[in-house]
């Protein structure tokens, strides 16, 4: 039995929830998110909470209910507060700048890298070596941050590359003669 699924999701003030069968739409100040939930999950709205439970006769229904509850909770937090990922560029000549709806990166390649941002994601560069990715969809914010990091991951000897602000890069010792 899922302990996560047992806890209801509390809907804060200013957040609107619409249930249409297995499709749930959540609207708030930061945007609107829609998700189709698994058929093994029973969803109902009671006052200012969303309650999840398993459908009878389905083997992994509690597990699916816990997953659905976690996803919907992230949707509620996203449309209310939003999610943020901060990236730091470390290395000589490594720079970031906004170019319209794309992030322009200079990462030591023979060409500049431009990463187009998907709809619903905003990015800003407070300094030349920082990128802040924000949005209401937690999965999409994390994916865009991971895509930006993948252009030049931190290398293990000097730690040069694109890293998350809270990431600790373990460095190796150089080879000795």
Curated annotation (Swiss-Prot):
GO biological process: cytoplasmic translation
MF term (GO), any: structural constituent of ribosome
Keyword Metal-binding attached: no
Transmembrane parts of this sequence: none
Statement: the UniProt record of this protein carries the keyword Ribonucleoprotein: yes
Pfam families for the chain: Ribosomal_L6 (PF00347)
Keyword entries, A-Z: Ribonucleoprotein, Ribosomal protein, RNA-binding, rRNA-binding
GO terms under cellular component: cytosolic large ribosomal subunit
Protein family per UniProt: Belongs to the universal ribosomal protein uL6 family.
Function (record text): This protein binds to the 23S rRNA, and is important in its secondary structure. It is located near the subunit interface in the base of the L7/L12 stalk, and near the tRNA binding site of the peptidyltransferase center.
Cross-referenced NCBIfam families: L6_bact (TIGR03654)
Assembly with partners or alone: Part of the 50S ribosomal subunit.
UniProt protein name: Large ribosomal subunit protein uL6
Species whose genome carries this gene: Aliivibrio fischeri (strain MJ11)
Lineage of the organism: Bacteria, Pseudomonadati, Pseudomonadota, Gammaproteobacteria, Vibrionales
